[in-house]
Design a protein with these regions (language model features):
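Short acidic-glycine-tyrosine-enriched beta hairpin
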Residues: 82-102
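An accessory alpha-helical subdomain
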Residues: 155-231
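Double-stranded beta-helix
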Residues: 113-183
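Bacterial Sec-dependent signal peptides at the C-terminal "C-region" and cleavage site
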Residues: 4, 8-28
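Conserved short histidine dyad/triad with adjacent acidic residue
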Residues: 41-63
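His/acidic/aromatic-lined binding-pocket segments of jelly-roll/cupin-type domains
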Residues: 59-61, 66-71, 89-90, 98, ...
Protein backbone atom coordinates (compact mmCIF):
# COMPACT_ATOMS: atom_id res chain seq x y z
CA UNK A 1 0.00 0.00 0.00
CA UNK A 2 1.31 3.43 -0.87
CA UNK A 3 1.93 5.91 1.88
CA UNK A 4 -0.57 8.72 2.23
CA UNK A 5 -0.05 12.10 3.76
CA UNK A 6 -2.41 12.98 6.60
CA UNK A 7 -4.00 16.40 6.51
CA UNK A 8 -4.36 18.91 9.29
CA UNK A 9 -7.82 19.68 10.67
CA UNK A 10 -10.92 18.44 8.91
CA UNK A 11 -10.19 19.37 5.32
CA UNK A 12 -12.88 17.66 3.31
CA UNK A 13 -11.91 19.56 0.22
CA UNK A 14 -8.66 20.93 1.52
CA UNK A 15 -8.12 23.87 -0.79
CA UNK A 16 -5.86 26.51 0.65
CA UNK A 17 -4.49 28.75 -2.06
CA UNK A 18 -2.40 31.87 -1.77
CA UNK A 19 -5.62 33.79 -1.09
CA UNK A 20 -5.52 32.81 2.57
CA UNK A 21 -2.27 34.73 3.01
CA UNK A 22 -3.35 37.97 1.33
CA UNK A 23 -4.87 41.04 2.88
CA UNK A 24 -8.63 41.34 2.29
CA UNK A 25 -8.20 44.37 0.04
CA UNK A 26 -6.06 42.51 -2.48
CA UNK A 27 -7.63 41.07 -5.62
CA UNK A 28 -7.64 37.38 -6.44
CA UNK A 29 -4.53 36.16 -8.23
CA UNK A 30 -4.09 33.87 -11.21
CA UNK A 31 -3.20 30.89 -9.04
CA UNK A 32 -6.55 30.98 -7.24
CA UNK A 33 -9.35 28.80 -8.52
CA UNK A 34 -12.15 30.60 -10.33
CA UNK A 35 -14.49 32.46 -7.94
CA UNK A 36 -12.56 31.30 -4.88
CA UNK A 37 -13.90 27.75 -4.94
CA UNK A 38 -12.26 24.61 -3.60
CA UNK A 39 -11.80 21.63 -5.92
CA UNK A 40 -10.61 18.08 -5.24
CA UNK A 41 -10.73 14.55 -6.59
CA UNK A 42 -12.14 12.26 -3.90
CA UNK A 43 -11.97 8.47 -3.76
CA UNK A 44 -14.39 7.49 -1.00
CA UNK A 45 -12.88 5.15 1.59
CA UNK A 46 -13.17 1.52 0.51
CA UNK A 47 -10.29 -0.15 2.35
CA UNK A 48 -12.58 -1.82 4.89
CA UNK A 49 -16.18 -1.45 6.05
CA UNK A 50 -17.30 0.84 8.85
CA UNK A 51 -19.02 -0.69 11.93
CA UNK A 52 -22.36 -0.72 10.09
CA UNK A 53 -20.90 -2.87 7.30
CA UNK A 54 -20.75 -0.07 4.73
CA UNK A 55 -17.73 1.40 2.98
CA UNK A 56 -18.07 5.07 3.78
CA UNK A 57 -16.64 8.36 4.89
CA UNK A 58 -17.26 10.16 8.16
CA UNK A 59 -20.61 11.92 8.69
CA UNK A 60 -20.01 15.64 9.08
CA UNK A 61 -21.52 19.10 8.62
CA UNK A 62 -20.32 22.50 7.39
CA UNK A 63 -21.16 25.82 9.03
CA UNK A 64 -21.22 28.35 6.18
CA UNK A 65 -20.02 26.60 3.02
CA UNK A 66 -22.03 24.99 0.23
CA UNK A 67 -20.72 21.74 -1.24
CA UNK A 68 -21.20 19.91 -4.52
CA UNK A 69 -20.46 16.34 -5.68
CA UNK A 70 -20.00 15.46 -9.36
CA UNK A 71 -19.62 11.70 -9.86
CA UNK A 72 -16.68 10.87 -12.11
CA UNK A 73 -16.87 7.07 -11.87
CA UNK A 74 -18.20 4.25 -9.73
CA UNK A 75 -21.38 4.37 -7.71
CA UNK A 76 -22.68 4.94 -4.22
CA UNK A 77 -24.98 7.25 -2.36
CA UNK A 78 -25.10 10.29 -0.12
CA UNK A 79 -27.00 10.23 3.16
CA UNK A 80 -28.41 13.64 4.08
CA UNK A 81 -29.90 14.96 7.32
CA UNK A 82 -31.36 18.42 7.80
CA UNK A 83 -33.84 20.08 10.13
CA UNK A 84 -36.45 20.62 7.38
CA UNK A 85 -36.69 17.16 5.81
CA UNK A 86 -34.83 14.85 8.18
CA UNK A 87 -33.06 11.82 6.69
CA UNK A 88 -32.93 10.80 3.02
CA UNK A 89 -30.52 9.18 0.58
CA UNK A 90 -29.47 10.24 -2.91
CA UNK A 91 -28.09 7.67 -5.34
CA UNK A 92 -24.84 8.73 -7.01
CA UNK A 93 -23.85 7.44 -10.46
CA UNK A 94 -21.53 8.85 -13.14
CA UNK A 95 -22.63 12.26 -14.40
CA UNK A 96 -24.89 13.01 -11.43
CA UNK A 97 -24.26 16.24 -9.52
CA UNK A 98 -25.57 16.92 -6.02
CA UNK A 99 -25.28 20.28 -4.27
CA UNK A 100 -26.32 21.08 -0.72
CA UNK A 101 -26.07 24.05 1.65
CA UNK A 102 -24.32 24.30 5.02
CA UNK A 103 -26.11 22.85 8.02
CA UNK A 104 -26.79 19.52 6.27
CA UNK A 105 -25.21 16.51 7.98
CA UNK A 106 -23.97 14.17 5.26
CA UNK A 107 -22.15 10.89 4.70
CA UNK A 108 -20.81 9.37 1.49
CA UNK A 109 -21.30 5.63 1.02
CA UNK A 110 -19.06 3.81 -1.48
CA UNK A 111 -20.79 0.92 -3.26
CA UNK A 112 -18.44 0.45 -6.23
CA UNK A 113 -15.22 2.48 -6.36
CA UNK A 114 -17.01 5.81 -5.98
CA UNK A 115 -14.85 8.68 -7.26
CA UNK A 116 -16.13 12.23 -7.06
CA UNK A 117 -15.07 15.71 -8.10
CA UNK A 118 -15.86 17.83 -5.06
CA UNK A 119 -16.63 21.53 -5.40
CA UNK A 120 -16.83 23.77 -2.36
CA UNK A 121 -17.37 27.47 -1.91
CA UNK A 122 -15.03 29.51 0.25
CA UNK A 123 -11.75 27.69 -0.41
CA UNK A 124 -9.76 27.20 2.77
CA UNK A 125 -12.59 27.30 5.32
CA UNK A 126 -12.55 23.54 5.95
CA UNK A 127 -9.14 23.86 7.60
CA UNK A 128 -10.32 26.83 9.63
CA UNK A 129 -13.14 24.97 11.41
CA UNK A 130 -16.02 25.10 8.92
CA UNK A 131 -16.47 21.30 9.13
CA UNK A 132 -17.27 19.13 12.14
CA UNK A 133 -17.47 15.33 12.31
CA UNK A 134 -20.41 13.77 14.14
CA UNK A 135 -19.16 11.75 17.14
CA UNK A 136 -22.26 12.09 19.32
CA UNK A 137 -23.07 14.16 22.39
CA UNK A 138 -20.59 12.57 24.79
CA UNK A 139 -17.64 13.44 22.56
CA UNK A 140 -18.99 16.92 21.81
CA UNK A 141 -18.92 17.55 25.57
CA UNK A 142 -15.33 16.29 25.91
CA UNK A 143 -12.98 18.60 24.02
CA UNK A 144 -9.90 16.47 24.70
CA UNK A 145 -11.54 13.34 23.27
CA UNK A 146 -12.88 15.27 20.30
CA UNK A 147 -9.39 16.59 19.53
CA UNK A 148 -7.92 13.09 19.89
CA UNK A 149 -10.37 11.59 17.43
CA UNK A 150 -9.96 14.40 14.93
CA UNK A 151 -6.18 14.00 15.07
CA UNK A 152 -6.11 10.24 14.43
CA UNK A 153 -5.38 10.62 10.71
CA UNK A 154 -2.41 12.84 11.40
CA UNK A 155 -1.15 10.56 14.17
CA UNK A 156 -1.66 7.16 12.53
CA UNK A 157 -2.07 7.71 8.80
CA UNK A 158 -4.65 5.73 6.83
CA UNK A 159 -5.46 3.40 9.72
CA UNK A 160 -6.03 6.42 11.93
CA UNK A 161 -8.36 7.96 9.36
CA UNK A 162 -10.37 4.72 9.26
CA UNK A 163 -10.46 4.54 13.07
CA UNK A 164 -11.78 8.11 13.14
CA UNK A 165 -14.43 7.16 10.58
CA UNK A 166 -15.38 4.09 12.63
CA UNK A 167 -15.88 6.13 15.81
CA UNK A 168 -18.05 8.57 13.92
CA UNK A 169 -20.17 5.83 12.34
CA UNK A 170 -20.77 4.16 15.71
CA UNK A 171 -22.35 7.37 16.97
CA UNK A 172 -24.09 7.92 13.65
CA UNK A 173 -25.80 4.52 13.89
CA UNK A 174 -27.55 5.74 17.02
CA UNK A 175 -28.77 8.83 15.18
CA UNK A 176 -30.14 6.68 12.35
CA UNK A 177 -31.89 4.44 14.88
CA UNK A 178 -33.64 7.50 16.33
CA UNK A 179 -34.96 8.38 12.87
CA UNK A 180 -36.75 5.02 12.83
CA UNK A 181 -37.80 4.74 16.46
CA UNK A 182 -38.27 8.28 17.80
CA UNK A 183 -38.53 11.10 15.28
CA UNK A 184 -38.73 13.80 17.96
CA UNK A 185 -35.56 12.54 19.63
CA UNK A 186 -33.87 12.42 16.23
CA UNK A 187 -34.77 16.05 15.56
CA UNK A 188 -33.52 17.12 18.99
CA UNK A 189 -30.19 15.35 18.53
CA UNK A 190 -29.68 16.71 15.03
CA UNK A 191 -30.46 20.23 16.20
CA UNK A 192 -28.16 19.82 19.20
CA UNK A 193 -25.26 18.80 16.97
CA UNK A 194 -25.82 21.58 14.45
CA UNK A 195 -26.14 24.15 17.24
CA UNK A 196 -22.87 22.94 18.81
CA UNK A 197 -21.07 23.39 15.52
CA UNK A 198 -22.60 26.76 14.69
CA UNK A 199 -21.61 28.09 18.11
CA UNK A 200 -18.04 26.84 17.66
CA UNK A 201 -17.89 28.30 14.15
CA UNK A 202 -19.11 31.69 15.38
CA UNK A 203 -15.94 31.97 17.45
CA UNK A 204 -13.94 31.81 14.20
CA UNK A 205 -15.97 34.41 12.37
CA UNK A 206 -12.96 36.69 11.77
CA UNK A 207 -10.92 33.88 10.17
CA UNK A 208 -13.89 32.85 8.04
CA UNK A 209 -14.49 36.43 6.92
CA UNK A 210 -10.88 36.87 5.82
CA UNK A 211 -11.04 33.71 3.72
CA UNK A 212 -14.30 34.86 2.11
CA UNK A 213 -12.99 38.35 1.39
CA UNK A 214 -9.74 37.13 -0.12
CA UNK A 215 -11.49 34.42 -2.14
CA UNK A 216 -15.02 34.81 -3.55
CA UNK A 217 -15.40 38.51 -2.68
CA UNK A 218 -12.08 39.36 -4.33
CA UNK A 219 -13.12 37.42 -7.42
CA UNK A 220 -16.45 39.23 -7.49
CA UNK A 221 -14.63 42.55 -7.40
CA UNK A 222 -12.39 41.40 -10.25
CA UNK A 223 -15.44 40.53 -12.37
CA UNK A 224 -16.87 44.01 -11.72
CA UNK A 225 -13.56 45.60 -12.71
CA UNK A 226 -13.58 43.65 -15.97
CA UNK A 227 -17.09 44.86 -16.77
CA UNK A 228 -16.16 48.45 -15.98
CA UNK A 229 -13.05 48.22 -18.17
CA UNK A 230 -14.89 47.07 -21.31
CA UNK A 231 -14.05 47.37 -24.19
CA UNK A 232 -10.49 47.23 -22.90
CA UNK A 233 -8.91 43.84 -22.26
CA UNK A 234 -9.83 42.60 -18.78
CA UNK A 235 -6.59 42.25 -16.81
CA UNK A 236 -3.12 40.80 -16.84
CA UNK A 237 -3.92 37.31 -15.57
CA UNK A 238 -2.29 34.42 -17.43
CA UNK A 239 -3.30 30.76 -17.84
CA UNK A 240 -2.39 28.59 -14.86
CA UNK A 241 -2.16 24.83 -14.40
CA UNK A 242 -2.27 22.37 -11.50
CA UNK A 243 -0.27 19.14 -11.69
CA UNK A 244 -1.75 16.38 -9.49
CA UNK A 245 0.27 15.18 -6.49
CA UNK A 246 1.83 11.72 -6.50
CA UNK A 247 0.22 10.77 -3.20
CA UNK A 248 -3.26 11.50 -1.83
CA UNK A 249 -4.07 13.12 1.48
CA UNK A 250 -6.46 11.72 4.08
CA UNK A 251 -9.77 13.52 4.34
CA UNK A 252 -12.95 12.90 6.28
CA UNK A 253 -14.55 11.00 3.41
CA UNK A 254 -11.65 9.41 1.58
CA UNK A 255 -8.42 9.86 -0.33
CA UNK A 256 -8.06 13.39 -1.66
CA UNK A 257 -6.10 14.93 -4.47
CA UNK A 258 -6.83 18.62 -4.02
CA UNK A 259 -6.01 21.47 -6.34
CA UNK A 260 -3.70 23.49 -4.13
CA UNK A 261 -0.80 24.84 -6.17
CA UNK A 262 -1.31 26.55 -9.52
CA UNK A 263 1.68 27.27 -11.75
CA UNK A 264 1.93 29.42 -14.87
CA UNK A 265 0.97 27.46 -18.00
CA UNK A 266 3.73 29.12 -19.98
CA UNK A 267 5.26 26.02 -21.59
CA UNK A 268 4.39 22.53 -22.82
CA UNK A 269 3.85 20.05 -19.97
Amino acid sequence: MRKTAAVLGFGFVLILTASACRKPAEAAKAEDLISGIGLTRLEVYGQRPAPDGLQSGSPHVHAVTDEGYYVMSGSGRVELHDLKQGFRTIEMTPGRYLQFPPGVLHRLVNEDHLTILVVMGNAGLAEKGDARIYFGQAVDENQAEFARLVGLAKAEGLEGALKRRDEAVRAYQSLLALWTSDRDAYNRELRRFIDVHMKAASERRADFLQAVETGPVAWGNRFKQRLAALPLSPDDLSPAIHLPPDEPTLGMCGLLRPVIKMDPADRDR
